[in-house]
Amino acid sequence: DDCIVVEYYIVTDSRFTQRFDSDQAVTDYVTVMFTGVQNLIETLNLDIKVRLLGVTPYHKESEPSFIDDSLLPGHETYVDARKIVRNMKFYFCNHNTGLAKSADIIILLITRKMGVLDPGDTDISEIAGASSISSVCQRCNNVGACVDNSDHNERADTVAHESVHLLGSPHDGEGPNGLGLPNSPGAANCPDSDGYIMGTRNEQNGKKFSECTKQCVKYLLSLPRASCVYENCSK
């Protein structure tokens, strides 16, 4: 019998790493965070397990240039959400070895703010995460970035949120357009105001996923392109 196991490789930018006394402390923190991610993913009721393959904390001297290359010009306290995903794809496509090669999803944790600045706009739209939609298992595309600038594990919800984008779900209230999955049910029938993780996250529903999200993830997992998350249960 097959089990669904989504395997993650986590990298942390040097500013994130600096918050900790050692690389082991970074790994310990992320390990606890992933207990939270597992608890949230379980609300999909799809028997999905998350597995942390490993953590690489970048330091100033070892940090790949794609992070600094992704800052918003003129607003260097912000990472450009679109650019960081694009640059991550390029970097890990060219460094597709070790844990990066083994992982179903690669996530970068950063402490800088992340935002989107559209042409002609002066106000930055601040966001907590960005990822490549429906791209689990797709080498060179299976990436996301999440902001974690607190000492608490509340960012498990951001990692879970971006994971579910990578697993084929839009935000609640959005149709399937843009998912790259022609027959996906989308999530237009679940208003974002219901307050689930892919919506406005209210007190009542903010720690679980909507039925629409569940159906979207279930659909992607039924396709051959998601085969990397299936493994023999005895492993």
UniProtKB/Swiss-Prot annotation:
Glycans are attached at residue 232. GO terms for cellular component: extracellular region. Zn(2+) binds at residues 161, 165, 171. One of its GO terms (biological process) is membrane protein ectodomain proteolysis. Its main location: secreted. The active site is at residue 162. PROSITE patterns: ADAM_MEPRO (PS50215). Keywords: Calcium, Disulfide bond, Glycoprotein, Hydrolase, Metal-binding, Metalloprotease, Protease, Secreted, Toxin, Zinc. It is an enzyme of class 3 (hydrolase). Its EC number is 3.4.24.-. Inhibited by EDTA. GO terms for molecular function: metal ion binding; metalloendopeptidase activity; toxin activity. The keyword Disulfide bond applies. Residues 4-232 form the Peptidase M12B domain. Its cofactor is Zn(2+). It comes from the Eukaryota. Expressed by the venom gland. Disulfide bonds join 137-228. It is found in: Secreted. InterPro entries: MetalloPept_cat_dom_sf (IPR024079), Peptidase_M12B (IPR001590). Acts as a metalloprotease. Penetrates intact tissue and specifically cleaves the vesicle-associated membrane protein 2 (VAMP2) (part of the SNARE complex) involved in pancreatic secretion, thus disrupting the normal vesicular traffic. Belongs to the venom metalloproteinase (M12B) family. PANTHER family: ADAM A DISINTEGRIN AND METALLOPROTEASE DOMAIN, ADAM METALLOPROTEASE. This is Venom metalloproteinase antarease-like TpachMP_B. It comes from Tityus pachyurus. The lineage of its organism: Eukaryota, Metazoa, Ecdysozoa, Arthropoda, Chelicerata.
